[in-house]
Amino acid sequence: MTIEKIFTPQDDAFYAVITHAAGPQGALPLTPQMLMESPSGNLFGMTQNAGMGWDANKLTGKEVLIIGTQGGIRAGDGRPIALGYHTGHWEIGMQMQAAAKEITRNGGIPFAAFVSDPCDGRSQGTHGMFDSLPYRNDAAIVFRRLIRSLPTRRAVIGVATCDKGLPATMIALAAMHDLPTILVPGGATLPPTVGEDAGKVQTIGARFANHELSLQEAAELGCRACASPGGGCQFLGTAGTSQVVAEALGLALPHSALAPSGQAVWLEIARQSARAVSELDSRGITTRDILSDKAIENAMVIHAAFGGSTNLLLHIPAIAHAAGCTIPDVEHWTRINRKVPRLVSVLPNGPDYHPTVRAFLAGGVPEVMLHLRDLGLLHLDAMTVTGQTVGENLEWWQASERRARFRQCLREQDGVEPDDVILPPEKAKAKGLTSTVCFPTGNIAPEGSVIKATAIDPSVVGEDGVYHHTGRVRVFVSEAQAIKAIKREEIVQGDIMVVIGGGPSGTGMEETYQLTSALKHISWGKTVSLITDARFSGVSTGACFGHVSPEALAGGPIGKLRDNDIIEIAVDRLTLTGSVNFIGTADNPLTPEEGARELARRQTHPDLHAHDFLPDDTRLWAALQSVSGGTWKGCIYDTDKIIEVINAGKKALGI
């Protein structure tokens, strides 16, 4: 292309440049006290507000900042001018607008700022996944900086939907200890009337490669899986789980998680949230009053009852850290999961695969909380953004018209009984729902691992509730190698796939959903186990062990495994105990203790290395989170610890 094709000829209007303007009409509502005592920035802020078109006579209202993860550019009729990364952030500008109008209607002044977010589905199996988890930390930092950069704000509303943008928003709000804050969940997209959900459809490549899907079927299913333009995926993955956790923390209004994006109830939630945060400000209730150790534990309880994503084992600790609360450890998670029953039957865990919009209609978080209240598993005195406690909110919910009408809507519209989506405890037990998360250890994972035990296919679990698998190892030093082996039909029934180098130092702790989803939706996949130092998408199911620690690149035993080694796995879904052990080879069987000694003698896999395309930004994140406590502390930045380590290093180096 020549420069002439870039700078095309223009008409006279192009050259008619105006060099001055009359400026806004009126005068700033200044007082002598303001001129004498206010910082110049506050005064100039009023000038900027008038310059952007706000009525100069209405510049003394309560300023409320709305932060959001909106992406893309929508035309007035909703058509895309420029696409976003995903449906989850495509429509939330409508919620932000609804909240802003409500603030204005009540005499306030709304401000808005944006930090958009990536799509973990879009980046699965690509180098984009290397930025996924580090993005959460970066976005939380930018959000906090934006909040502090508007020093006149009286309250903050966060609007977000998906896997990393929503946790980042919650972490940012949690750090605003002395401000009223509230979270507006971005809701859920609808499932297609005929077709597949956004989780299963991500396996069209693997199923086509294994001759289980035609090209035409793949093309049609892929086209319609996101059946409405806004909202998070239809399953209870990391996005959906983060929404219910926000509500459980008391940071979002009751019955606000998982609402169908773009619909009247979804918009009204934004307006209600604007009214609520203004009331919090009037009453002097701040984030510090809401995010307590009790709130954190309520969130862990709801996570277990919903059967939530294992990624929240990274996000809830990070929220707790930002809020100044106690960071939950493995023992705390185990204690919660052993006593809290899973009550929700939705995608991807089942046993009935309802989309999350049905969980919303069945009553969502407050309906689950009613059952947990009766079991004595909640802190009912925890404060929430309604200005009332959890217990008071539940009293309202139980007798509300909202509850009755939405549950009836589910019966009439879909022919589904609400208690088949959110099950009473006895019914859940009778249907075989088991507790959510387990932390197996062993000579491969001496510092632990994570499995969503409730999501192991029941057909491969014994009558005693224990999953046993002893099989030969297939070692892969990258996810790309592993998915290629699946597509080339090189994995056979009974294999144990081990993917190493996927921890923080290798890939930024990438998600490996294309592996777990392929194993779920290929007919023989349930007979294969997966072990990795990477993590999993919230929609992952099956005998998949992630977060293996220490990671391979830190010298962890997982990095010393070789093809044709034998691994023995046991996971008790009832007691939530488990083990993952190397037990030698077919020719040289070993006990777990002998296996540990053998692994200690071995060298790390010769092909193991950090990914060639790992960004420097992610390498820095990996180093900072490592000295801050690593994955078991939520991959946080502990500033004091980081400074301590840097100073010690400078001293040792004589800098």
From Swiss-Prot:
Its EC number is 4.2.1.82. One of its GO terms (cellular component) is cytosol. The keyword Lyase applies. GO terms for molecular function: hydro-lyase activity; xylonate dehydratase activity. Disruption phenotype: Disruption mutant has reduced ability to catabolize D-xylonic acid. YjhG-yagF double mutant cannot use D-xylonate as the sole source of carbon. GO terms for biological process: aldonic acid catabolic process. Keywords: Lyase. The keyword Lyase applies. Coiled coil: none annotated. Pfam families: ILV_EDD_C, ILVD_EDD_N. Induction: Expression is repressed by the transcriptional regulator XynR. It catalyses: D-xylonate = 2-dehydro-3-deoxy-D-arabinonate + H2O. NCBIfam families: yjhG_yagF. Belongs to the IlvD/Edd family. Catalyzes the dehydration of D-xylonic acid to form 2-dehydro-3-deoxy-D-pentonate. This is D-xylonate dehydratase YagF. The gene is yagF.
